[in-house]
Structures are given as structure tokens and as C-alpha cells.
Amino acid sequence: MQDIKVAVDAVIFGYFDKQDLQLLLIKRKIEPFKGGWALPGGLVLDDENLDDAVKRELHEEAGIKPDFLEQLYTFGNVGRDPRNRVVSVAYLGLVNPSYHELFADSDAEDAQWFSVNRLPSLAFDHKNIIDIALKRLRTKLQYQPIGFNLLNEEFPFSDLENLYRTIIGREIDRRNFRKKIMSYGLLNETNNIKKEGSGRPGKLFTFNQEKYEELEKEGFYFEIK
């Protein structure tokens, strides 16, 4: 008789102002890979839905509740877990770290943010899961403005530019980027400004969720050059 366990793993990205894209990792308190870094996650309880399981694990192991969370992919290669045959349903999530204080508990010894460009050695097949999640994130930016989940409620346009440039990993045509974003009506201009250094004060914007929902029904593709 087969004995296959079902688990969930969460790839949670965060963005600190003008820094690299960050990834949430936990330090394992138990074997296997005790003391090693891994994605938050664990086995699904018998009476638990998958979505509830990943939210529980994130709360228990890191003390956070993502602003955006969706199923990513299912991983089930033989031998991916040395203990049992384990099939893991991975999730992709986004949080604004400014609003979330990490708190490790349960079977996590610690929880920290790491730059996606400087990750430590990882347990299980979690490096592969992260690579697939990063590709999905970069693709989704082309048709769904999920990046706004990583910004403050009010933000200067330069922060949005920096975020997109950081996630896709290359320079963008700033003039074309601004023109496209503004033409879609996805931003509401506020009466507030933000002054940084000796430069001109920047106007602050908010994300227009209603406008996005209208565009989503019509179908649109936001190509970043």
C-alpha cells in the first residue's frame, strides 16, 4: 500500500526600498537538514485544505500573512524527502516586509529575509522550487500588476520603477514604462510628496484596484521593455 504524504511549501518574496528582491527562509529546528535553511512549509493535516495549510505554516514558522498568495506548482520527484514519499504543493506569495515582523516558532529555529542573489545552501529541492517561482513572478508582471503588493500604500513613481527593474533583473526604458503605466490609469495621484536627498520632491501615488479589475476583465498585456 502506498504511503504518500502531502505537504505545502511557500516561496514568499519581499522588497525592501532600493534593495534586492528578498526571499523568506526559515532555519529548520528538526531533522532532516536540522540547522539548514529552507522554505516555510510542512505536512498538510488530515482535516485541512491546502490553502489553510500553507497559511498555518507561514503563521507558525514566520508569523506572517501574505498580501498575495497563489498555488505555483506541484513537486513530487522520488527521493525529494529522505524520510518518506512526499508530494509538495508550492505556493507563490508576496508581502511588504515593512508591515510584517518575522517571528519564528513551531519547528523553525529562525526566520530571515535573504537576497535572491545571495541565497544560502537550501534543504530538499527548494532551490528548484525558488527558481520556478522567480520565473513565474517575472512572467506575471507582464499581465498582472502584483508588484504593488510589495510597495507601501503611497509611493513615488521611482519606487515602482526600481521594483520592476529589480524583479526582472535588468534596466527598463523608464520613459516608455511611465507612459504605459499612466495610460492604463492604474495609478491615482495624491496630494502628498516625498523628498529624498537634493532631488526634486516626488509626487506620491496609490494603486487603482478598481481600474485594474476593469482591465483584467477586458484582458491586457503589459510588455516591459
Predicted regions and their residues:
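Short histidine-centered catalytic/ligand-binding loop motif
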Residues: 39-47, 149-150
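RNA substrate-recognition surfaces in RNA-acting enzymes
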Residues: 172-203
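Core subunits and conserved enzymes of cellular information-processing
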Residues: 15-23, 51-55, 59-63, 69, ...
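Active-site segment of metal-dependent pyrophosphate-handling enzymes
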Residues: 4-6, 52-55, 59-102, 117-118, ...
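Long, intrinsically disordered, low-complexity Ser/Thr/Pro-rich regulatory/activation regions
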Residues: 193-225
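Short helix-coil junctions and helix-kink-helix linkers
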Residues: 162-171
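N-terminal strand-loop-strand
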Residues: 1-37
